[in-house]
């Protein structure tokens, strides 16, 4: 402090010293017990919460009663709030290298088809769910923006006709597409997570924290698109494969989660 008063120390150094003193005092005064983990889920429908609760939080998360009955998606096309569209039996399921990234056209076309079905169902039941599409790769983001351009315009028109979308930034543009970074701190009623990968090592997407954030953006409906069998057993250079836990949970909880064979949805698939 004397060095700062004499102009010999920068404010940043003083701030660091001050912070260090606070931390040291915390330890010295034994107030670690005041630190606690946030254990209540105020965002997601309980089935969605349980998907990442078991693998990533050791089952400690609890869904608040404050959102009970307020997170149903009320759509007829899905019978759960957790849905995996499994591409394992698709002949065109493999991802491709583009520059330093990856793309998966099969997944993109399936998402396009899913969005058309969502729009039809939302129109039928007068629902206005906000939608976000998350994918690990920027290259896939660009492909999705291209393939989904038509349906995005249709969603935008639908929202404008059926709600005051100018007052809701999540509806204004139809839906959002991006990597998890663009969804940090936000959520959507419906999240579609595009796994992209269907071959090779999955090091880039095997980040547990980023996967956790991606899945936990959904409030009412979480749709995962990807090759379940591959992702369950995929190899990583270091650490564990987090998809193993997710796939295991979904497969063991079919009463709570819905698995749809993407191969059965080939007929009538929209090409964008």
Q: Where are the predicted features?
A:
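Conserved helicase motor core of SF1/SF2 NTP-dependent helicases
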Residues: 1-272
């Amino acid at each position: 402090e004397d060095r700062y008063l004499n102009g010999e120390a920068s404010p940043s150094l003083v701030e660091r010293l001050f912070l260090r003193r606070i931390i040291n005092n915390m330890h010295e005064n034994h107030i670690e017990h005041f630190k606690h983990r946030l254990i209540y889920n105020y965002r997601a429908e309980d089935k969605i919460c349980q998907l990442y609760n078991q693998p990533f939080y050791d089952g400690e998360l609890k869904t608040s009663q404050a959102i009970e009955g307020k997170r149903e998606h009320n759509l007829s096309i899905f019978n759960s709030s957790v849905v995996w569209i499994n591409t394992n039996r698709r002949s065109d399921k493999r991802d491709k290298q583009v520059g330093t990234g990856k793309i998966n056209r099969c997944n993109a076309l399936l998402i396009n088809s899913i969005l058309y079905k969502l729009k039809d169902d939302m129109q039928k039941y007068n629902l206005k769910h906000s939608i976000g599409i998350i994918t690990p790769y920027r290259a896939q983001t660009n492909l999705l923006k291209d393939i989904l351009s038509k349906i995005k315009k249709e969603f935008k028109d639908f929202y404008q006709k059926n709600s005051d979308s100018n007052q809701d930034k999540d509806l204004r543009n139809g839906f959002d597409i991006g990597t998890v970074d663009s969804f940090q701190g936000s959520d959507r009623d419906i999240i579609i997570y595009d796994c992209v990968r269907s071959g090779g090592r999955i090091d880039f997407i095997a980040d547990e924290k980023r996967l956790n954030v991606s899945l936990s953006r959904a409030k009412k409906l979480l749709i995962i698109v990807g090759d379940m069998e591959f992702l369950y057993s995929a190899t990583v250079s270091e650490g564990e494969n987090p998809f193993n836990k997710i796939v295991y949970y979904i497969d063991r909880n079919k009463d709570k989660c819905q698995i749809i064979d993407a191969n059965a949805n080939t007929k009538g698939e929209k090409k964008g």
